[in-house]
From Swiss-Prot:
It is a lipid-anchor. The gene is BDG4. The keyword Lyase does not apply. Its main location: membrane. SUPFAM superfamilies: alpha/beta-Hydrolases. A lipid is attached at C50 (N-palmitoyl cysteine). Disulfide bonds: none annotated. Induction: By UV-B. Keywords: Cell membrane, Cell wall, Cell wall biogenesis/degradation, Hydrolase, Lipoprotein, Membrane, Palmitate, Secreted, Signal. The active site is at H154, S225 (nucleophile), D367 (charge relay system), H395 (charge relay system). This is Probable lysophospholipase BODYGUARD 4. Expressed in epidermal cells. Residues 150-259 form the AB hydrolase-1 domain. Its EC number is 3.1.1.-.
Length: 417
């Protein structure tokens, strides 16, 4: 490595240390602030993970467990004396203020959006996921069941739009029933405050909302990013009826310690900007909640401003999807699915391969979110997995920018099963 490159790397490391040192302090202060406001505004406030200890597991099912990264994020300021003094003062003040406060329990936290659109899921009494179905079976044969069912699972901070707006229109064959879901906590699906959004929670809701009501006796699964880990868990549980699993840009870190997964996905660094944003939202619970409060709670204002700037009545579905979650659902899905789910991915892959399920992986060579070596690691560990590297594609554009080509590839995979 040349001297200028070494010097630049050293400067970047130093600046990253300074910035994240400041963010550690800010998050520790915000911890006390949010704790104070929550106790005043909420009847049953939910505690954070800053001082919580990891609970003793009562189950051997790894899919059901909370990730260790929720409890093990180091912050040197959490035990400082001035924060202890602040908490003591906060407790006395909040007790006085709570006496004169009449609480009304809400499905949302005060820092979440309570607009009609964001609370529409509360009208769904059965608690099932939002499912978009495209049944392309010809009308004259509508009495027959489609020969192929396909479940589409989106990634982090996405929704069923990721598939319906890009791929569905290009799949024209008459024997496919396409089912795109909004995962628990995202899009138009329920966002319960008492859920920990573990792999088991996601799999159970898909079973209850798709597999059972649509009586699927066989199906294919197509998933993107975080959805790949959920797809593997779902397919492994139903390995006797699943035909194929297509993984697009899966965050695969074989047999890793969960903290190591967090460091790989969201290493603390300033550059590139996308990596910095990922690190902030993954490491700092309270700063992340501030971001969600500013952007998600006030998404109507931001959408109005964007419409004003671009001069259009409607804004792109990707922009809308970014705000259609709560901090609670995004935070827990990030840690319990991406970090916690990584350590059971090998187990799920082994189950599928032993059952003879066809597994196909696709990833863009310009992906800056999921490292390109993830696909190589999976291929080395499981040679039976078919891998396609898409030249010039990044994390999303391999689908959103190549819908027709991607649909043709999917149909070829399904036909080969």
């Amino acid at each position: 490595m040349s001297f200028p490159r070494k010097f630049g790397t050293a400067i970047h490391a130093a600046l990253s240390f300074i910035v994240f040192f400041f963010l550690d302090l800010l998050d520790a202060i915000l911890c006390v602030v949010y704790e104070f406001v929550d106790e005043i505004l909420e009847e049953n406030s939910t505690g954070c993970y800053c001082t919580a200890a990891a609970p003793q597991s009562q189950t051997t099912d790894e899919n059901e467990l909370s990730s260790e990264t929720l409890f093990g994020r180091r912050n040197i300021f959490r035990g400082m004396w001035f924060l202890g003094f602040a908490r003591e003062f906060k407790s006395k003040l909040s007790r006085k203020l709570r006496k004169s406060k009449i609480h009304q329990e809400s499905v949302n936290r005060w820092s979440d959006c309570g607009c009609k659109s964001c609370k529409s899921w509360t009208k769904n009494e059965d608690g099932n996921l939002h499912v978009v179905v495209k049944d392309s079976t010809s009308r004259e044969y509508s009495v027959q069941e489609p020969s192929e069912n396909v479940i589409f699972i989106h990634g982090f901070m996405g929704s069923s739009h990721f598939w319906t707006e890009t791929v569905f229109e290009h799949i024209q064959k008459d024997d496919y029933r396409l089912l795109a879901i909004d995962l628990l906590g995202f899009g138009e699906s329920p966002k319960p405050r008492d859920s920990l959004y573990t792999l088991k929670d996601h799999v159970d809701t898909i079973e209850r909302s798709v597999i059972k009501p649509y009586q699927l006796d066989s199906f294919h699964v197509v998933a993107h990013s975080m959805g790949c880990l959920i797809a593997l868990a779902l397919a492994a549980k139903h390995s006797n009826i699943v035909k194929s699993v297509t993984l697009v840009a899966p965050p695969y870190f074989p047999s890793s310690v969960e903290g190591s997964v967090l460091n790989r996905i969201a290493r603390k660094r300033l550059w590139p900007p996308l990596a910095f944003g990922t690190a902030v939202m993954s490491w700092y619970e309270h700063i992340g909640r501030c971001v969600c409060f500013i952007i998600c709670k006030h998404h109507k204002i931001w959408e109005w401003l964007i419409k004003l700037c671009i001069g259009k009545r409607e804004i792109h579905w990707k922009i809308k999807d970014i705000t259609r979650h709560t901090h609670h659902s995004a935070w827990h899905s990030m840690h319990n699915v991406i970090c916690g789910g990584s350590k059971v991915a090998d187990e799920h892959l082994e189950t599928l391969i032993k059952s003879g399920v066809k597994i196909h992986l696709m990833q863009g060579d310009c992906d800056q979110i999921v490292p390109s070596h993830c696909s190589g690691n999976m291929k080395r560990t499981f040679p039976a997995v078919e891998v396609d590297i898409i030249t010039g594609a990044d994390h999303d554009s391999m689908i959103s920018g190549r819908g027709e080509e991607f649909a043709e590839k999917l149909e070829s995979i399904w036909c080969s099963c």
